Amino acid sequence: EREVCLPDSSLDPMFFLHGDGWLQRWQLQDLSVNHIALGLRVQHDCGFDYSALLVYRLSDEGLTAHLTLRHCGTEPMLDGVGFHPFFVKTSQTQIQFFSSGYWPEGEKHLPLSWQRNMPDDIDFSCAKVPNNVWMNHGYSGWNGVAHLVTPHQPTVTIRSSVPYLMLFQMPNEPFICLEPQSHPVDAHNMEGQ
């Protein structure tokens, strides 16, 4: 066991939950009419040493976004990745995904104990319009597919190989985030993670 001092972040001074990739200037790697590839290389004194590649591609089937993270350091490190797209949401947008349980949000936005039984208002195994309330929950046992369906709009389907999904929304806002993640929030402090 070793102690790692996380890098300072003025936007998340207590936890560094969102890392720092989203705060960096990414470099153009490749560009064409139907795709763009952006690369990032980050090294911190504490041992976080990684590269990332983000590729957006348009096709007849839709938009594909692919995010890859590679640890480049000589010592093992607790790296993880989360992809946080914001989607337009109306009062009629329905969300649907399967999961085996969830972590309710606790104090300081950290998760409480994992729960197998979900209240109906946050169980999206059947498509439904989310309540217009603050939601910030992590789901486990996600099968890697989520749908956002809004009448008279293209259906959004999210497909990912990672086992965790965050759902985030603020009341009275026209967006929702469905965030595939490689790990649960605060995983480094969870038993068995």
Regions found by a protein language model. Give the residues of each.
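Active-site/ligand-binding surface loops and adjacent short beta/alpha elements
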Residues: 78, 85-160
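Extended, loop-rich substrate-binding clefts of extracytoplasmic carbohydrate-active enzymes
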Residues: 13-60
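Short solvent-exposed strand-capping/beta-turn motif centered on an Asx-Ser/Thr pair
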Residues: 70-75, 151
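Acidic-aromatic substrate-binding/catalytic surfaces of carbohydrate-active enzymes
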Residues: 1-13, 176
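A residue-level signal for conserved active-site and pocket-lining positions in enzyme catalytic cores
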Residues: 28, 84, 178
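Short coil/turn motifs at secondary-structure junctions
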Residues: 45, 72-74, 86, 90
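Beta-strand-rich recognition/accessory modules
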Residues: 37, 43, 129-193
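Short, well-ordered beta-strand segments enriched in hydrophobic/aromatic residues
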Residues: 54-56, 63-71
